[in-house]
Design a protein with these regions (language model features):
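Long compositionally biased, domain-poor regions of proteins
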Residues: 103-106, 118-142, 193-206, 216-259
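An N-terminus-focused feature that recognizes amino-terminal "leader" regions
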Residues: 2-21, 25-132
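Short beta-strand edge/turn micro-motifs at domain boundaries
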Residues: 2, 31, 128-190, 253-259
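Compositionally biased, intrinsically disordered low-complexity regions
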Residues: 22-25, 153, 246
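Core segments of small alpha/beta cavity-forming domains
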Residues: 38-90, 164-235
Length: 259
């Protein structure tokens, strides 16, 4: 029971850490050194082809509880998260419905950066059972590699997304050290991890509004704690940013969307 509960909460918390955060408005970010081209790296049809290929294979992996194929279509946080989710599904016989990724698209935000890695932020529609939209982050690490799904974030109720250029125009990628904002993207991720770890005792608590992710994590923690106490077990959670696991896209108004 103890190991089983730990596995479930590990999968849930990993999913939560893939949340997107908007950079605060302020001065325009300092331009980064990488080059920008006039056209986006993918057309809308190419984005659809990439997304459809990956999600079709992922659906097959979900149905077969197949973790061996995942590295061919996933990388980074999403590879770790989906592997954990499928391992939990193998043990419980049930795959959480929140792992569903809608196939319909609301908006594609396509990078115009000429170098690598390149990113595409795809915002889906809601699911058939009216779950929230998903933000999908696809990355291509080099010219000789296919795009892979790097991150998935559930866009909780009340989330306000920044405005982006249309897919025909494309958007510039940001960097973890972008300046001209209230804080750099890396500092924003560090601050949010501190909020998750320390809650009301975080030094950033007074500067941050409540959000659904932290509320849901608090509820989940309380539920798991009750189960642990019934079985004379203990639980411990640690939240810290993974070095390099960050993706940034510039919004139309000069802010950053950070995942």
């Amino acid at each position: 029971m103890r190991k089983h509960s730990q596995a479930i909460i590990a999968a849930m918390l990993a999913l939560g850490m893939a949340v997107g955060m908007c950079g605060c408005e302020g001065q325009l970010p300092t331009p980064k050194a990488t080059t920008r081209q006039d056209a986006p790296n993918l057309s809308a049809k190419q984005e659809q082809k990439v997304r459809t290929r990956i999600l079709k294979t992922l659906d097959q992996c979900n149905q077969n509880r197949d973790t061996d194929t995942l590295p061919t279509i996933l990388e980074g946080p999403e590879l770790d998260i989906r592997t954990s989710e499928l391992n939990v599904a193998k043990a419980t016989g049930n795959l959480d419905r929140k792992t569903t990724i809608p196939t319909d698209l609301a908006q594609a935000v396509i990078s115009t950066d000429a170098g690598w890695p390149r990113s595409v932020f795809s915002i889906t529609s809601t699911t058939k059972d009216q779950q929230s939209k998903r933000l999908l982050v696809f990355k291509q690490d080099s010219a000789r590699q296919n795009y892979k799904l790097w991150g998935v974030a559930r866009l909780f109720s009340g989330v306000k997304m920044p405005s982006f250029e249309i897919s025909k125009t494309g958007s510039a990628q940001g960097t973890p050290t972008d300046t001209g904002l209230v804080m750099t993207p890396k500092a924003a991720v560090d601050a949010y991890a501190d909020l998750l770890q320390n809650g009301a005792n975080s030094k950033y608590a007074s500067k941050s509004a409540d959000d659904d992710l932290r509320s849901k994590l608090a509820d989940l923690t309380a539920q798991v704690q009750k189960a642990m106490e019934l079985n004379e077990g203990t639980q411990q959670q640690t939240f810290e940013p993974v070095n390099g696991a960050i993706s940034v896209m510039r919004s139309a108004d000069g802010g950053d969307l950070v995942v």
